[in-house]
Amino acid sequence: MFIAWYWIVLIALVVVGYFLHLKRYCRAFRQDRDALLEARNKYLNSTREETAEKVE
């Protein structure tokens, strides 16, 4: 079965575009996750300090 050259080019462009989209999306997701984790850690540390002050 003959596949026209433009179908091969189209499939290659879709694959490359999908790869670049995933790369960008994963980077943004990682930055969001790191920011949320940092905020959570700050909150937990401040809560621990307040609890330690109340106990003393």
Swiss-Prot record:
Alphabetized UniProt keyword annotations: Cell inner membrane, Cell membrane, Membrane, Transmembrane, Transmembrane helix
Subcellular location: Cell inner membrane
Record membrane topology: Single-pass membrane protein
Gene Ontology CC terms, in alphabetical order: plasma membrane
Coiled coil: none
Listed transmembrane segments: 2-22
Top-level division of the source organism's lineage: Bacteria
Induction (record text): Expressed approximately equally in exponential and stationary phases (at protein level).
Stated name of the protein: Protein YqiD
Taxonomic lineage from the root: Bacteria, Pseudomonadati, Pseudomonadota, Gammaproteobacteria, Enterobacterales
